[in-house]
Amino acid sequence: MRKITQEACRAFENAQNYKKSNTKVVRINEVSAEMYLHGNLIAYSDESGIFISNGGWSSNTTKERLNGLTGVNIRQVNYRWYLNGDFWNGGWIRISD
């Protein structure tokens, strides 16, 4: 995992602001944050959990950033993404605890 991914995911999971290169985490409040990649929202958290999306881009960088989050395991087989073993079209989904 790249250092930028580790730093961004740590900031996201601790609801702290972070900005480096193409990745930004915005603290909303003490329990909520949003993660952006190239200006596209790819993850947000609130009191009900963590939600992810590919932001419309099935790129290796998007996959890498999301895979840095706790509870996320995205794999690609024949250009199709699988989230925690199940096919995923990249739309918004809540990550189970």
What are these regions (language model features)?
Residues 1-97:
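Terminal leader/tail segments of proteins
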